[in-house]
Swiss-Prot record:
The protein's name in its UniProt record: L-proline cis-4-hydroxylase
Keyword terms of this UniProt record: Dioxygenase, Iron, Metal-binding, Oxidoreductase
Gene Ontology MF terms: 2-oxoglutarate-dependent dioxygenase activity; metal ion binding
Species whose genome carries this gene: Mesorhizobium japonicum (strain LMG 29417 / CECT 9101 / MAFF 303099)
EC number, as in UniProt: 1.14.11.56
Length: 280
């Protein structure tokens, strides 16, 4: 697994609580909601223009500017300036995942002419929140800074009533990982990759493929969401959902559904145009 922890920050809970109270009253964007199964949303703290309405991520070469919301969060700004090279920051966002929501397994940067170094600083989480990369599952702990290899297939999910909050920072892509996180403590010896998922069996697979009996345009999105979440609970590769979906649609025999399944895999894993949105 190329994703790894870079260090730990001792969070000031009082000051963090003050900033989170401001965020709780703020408007979160639904941009990129086509990547979500359930409620996944974000708000920009820093971006290319400093304008709150700039929501899409593009490759640029100038230090990110604070948005009005970002300027109103003194502690989060301090975390950004103290633990990252501010001249290398291109975007900073708060990403919130709510109960029983996940990101559909995907690869980032497919629509960009370049890529960033993406890091997560965990602000609030619990044991029912997980990240995945390919066939691995892991838990990012509170106060930890992680490098996420977003070019590989990955996902994230929250299966708790309490939302998960991460400060996600995109760093200029030519920096070395050793330069990304600064003024941090060494991580603890805890094992972040303990895998308690169930074994995958032929019987389970046939149960999943049984969706071919009922799949239709009316329930297609709901079935995609179920398939996207299975790898959080069973020992399978996160992209296996696309093979299952294509086989379900093939067994159903409806050309429109087969085309939708192929388009879904293409968009999330293979190729997508700048500004392209997936509707399904």
């Amino acid at each position: 697994m190329t994703t790894r922890i870079l260090g730990v920050v001792q969070l000031d809970q009082r000051r963090l609580t003050d900033d989170l109270a401001v965020l709780a009253k703020s408007n979160f964007s639904s941009e990129y909601s086509d990547f979500a199964c359930g409620r996944w949303e974000f708000c920009m703290l820093r971006n290319q223009s400093g304008k709150q309405e700039e929501q899409r991520v593009v490759v640029h070469e100038t230090p990110a500017l604070a948005t009005p919301l970002g300027q109103s969060l003194p502690y989060l700004n301090e975390l950004l300036d103290n633990h990252f090279d501010r001249d290398s920051i291109r975007y900073a966002r708060i990403i919130r995942i709510s109960e029983n929501a996940c990101i559909i397994p995907h690869r980032d940067y497919l629509e960009l002419e370049g890529k960033f170094i993406r890091v997560h600083l965990v602000l609030d989480t619990n044991e029912k929140c997980s990240n995945t990369e390919e066939n691995n599952i892991f838990h990012m702990g509170r106060g930890e800074i992680w490098f996420l290899d977003a070019s590989l297939p990955h996902s994230a999910g929250c299966f708790s009533p309490t939302p998960r909050l991460h400060l996600v920072v995109d760093i200029e892509g030519t920096r070395s990982l050793e330069e990304v996180a600064i003024n941090v403590e060494q991580p603890s010896a805890r094992n972040a990759t303990v895998d308690t998922r169930k074994e995958w069996t032929d019987e389970t697979l046939e149960s999943v493929l049984g969706f071919s009996e009922i799949i239709s345009e009316a329930n297609y999105r709901e079935i995609v969401a179920i398939l996207a979440k299975l790898h959080f609970f069973h020992k399978v590769h996160c992209v296996d959902m696309y093979g299952w979906l294509k086989e379900i649609c093939r067994r159903r025999g409806e050309p429109a559904l087969i085309e939708k399944a192929n388009s879904l895999e293409r968009f999330y894993l293979i190729d997508r145009a700048a500004g392209e949105v997936m509707t399904y």
